[in-house]
């Protein structure tokens, strides 16, 4: 009996040791091979092949993808029972897990994103009483706010009316970001390792980064920013000059104008979408032709370039350009910085350029500074 128990104990111990060694050995193999181990399954071969031609070619699969035992068992079940879809797509939980991995290498970009409105949570967006009391939530909201959510709007938030109170009903999702990194970035794509883009302001446009791409939840595919079109916009009947910077095409996917309302002057005359309609902020007036990213940081929408980047500090009329009556200085100003025109303030004509001495003479005297 003792011999049998000893043999059983040795057998169980050996099996446990083999399982532990096998598990850790397999994990080490898959982690250390930069995807070659993952590519041994035919479902993953194409994805590994693409990433080996991408800027993340020296990054291992497990550096970005969650690889718990539960995930591995789920993958094994799918592989064995043949339920693999024609094209493998990430679930929302997978994307959210990967977002936290992005900051391991992209700390600066992640910090900017996390500090800005693009990191807004599902609760902040879909339980906003100010918005929801005016406009009822609909599936189309998920196109930009929750493109990786796998269900319909009714599966995410209730009630679907303008009375409320509203609550995110999907457990564990309320405090997660609705617009993760992969909403605008495609990781598995071909391209060279990237460098810092030219920071100069451009009207014609710069070479667009390979990673910039819009994720379309209907097609469950990324569309590269360079392949997206730019809209034709009007100011009344006049065709507005729109920056040809290809990065701006990505912004337009969500910060978009609306078609003219039925019965409006623009609709009657078939002028087309108007600047400033919907969520559009296309520059017009003194800033016409300048792209979004000329002034804005794409990760947090903050202005990365001040007025003095392009303008002398003192304007032609002797006023500090950053203190003029525009929304740059005061968000409540009637003169939106995106559309301000000289004539908004100078209805009787533009004044002649003043000399520095004349401009200084108009300024209030401050002891120790200018007087």
Stretches found by the model and what they are:
Residues 1-371:
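Short sequence/structural segments immediately N-terminal
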């Amino acid at each position: 009996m003792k011999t049998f128990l000893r043999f059983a104990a040795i057998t169980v111990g050996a099996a446990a040791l083999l399982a532990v060694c096998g598990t850790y050995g397999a994990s080490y193999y898959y982690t250390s091979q930069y995807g070659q181990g993952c590519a041994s399954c035919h479902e993953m071969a194409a994805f590994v092949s693409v990433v080996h031609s991408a800027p993340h070619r020296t990054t291992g699969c497990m550096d970005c993808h969650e690889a718990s035992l539960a995930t591995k068992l789920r993958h094994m079940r799918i592989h064995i029972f043949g339920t693999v879809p024609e094209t493998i797509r990430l679930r929302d939980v997978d994307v959210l897990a990967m977002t936290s991995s992005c900051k391991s290498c992209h700390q600066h970009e992640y910090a900017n994103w996390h500090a800005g409105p693009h990191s807004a949570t599902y609760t902040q967006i879909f339980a906003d009483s100010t918005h929801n009391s005016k406009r009822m939530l609909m599936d189309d909201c998920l196109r930009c706010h929750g493109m990786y959510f796998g269900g319909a709007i009714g599966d995410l938030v209730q009630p679907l009316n303008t009375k409320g109170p509203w609550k995110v009903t999907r457990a564990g999702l309320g405090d997660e970001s609705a617009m993760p990194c992969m909403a605008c970035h495609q990781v598995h794509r071909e391209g060279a390792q990237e460098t810092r883009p030219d920071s100069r302001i451009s009207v014609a446009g710069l070479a667009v980064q390979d990673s910039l791409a819009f994720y379309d939840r209907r097609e469950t595919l990324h569309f590269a920013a360079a392949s997206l079109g730019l809209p034709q916009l009007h100011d009344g009947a006049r065709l507005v000059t729109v920056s040809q910077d290809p990065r701006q095409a990505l912004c337009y996917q969500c910060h978009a104008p609306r078609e003219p309302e039925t019965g409006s002057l623009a609709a009657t005359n078939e002028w087309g979408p108007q600047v400033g309609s919907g969520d559009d902020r296309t520059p017009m007036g003194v800033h016409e032709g300048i792209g979004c990213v000329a002034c804005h940081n794409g990760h947090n929408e903050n202005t990365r370039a001040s007025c003095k980047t392009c303008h002398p500090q003192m304007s032609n009329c002797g006023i500090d350009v950053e203190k003029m009556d525009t929304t740059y200085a005061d968000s409540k100003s009637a003169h939106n910085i995106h559309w301000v025109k000289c004539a908004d303030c100078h209805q009787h004509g533009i004044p002649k350029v003043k000399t520095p001495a004349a401009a200084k003479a108009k300024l209030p005297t401050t002891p120790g500074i200018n007087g």
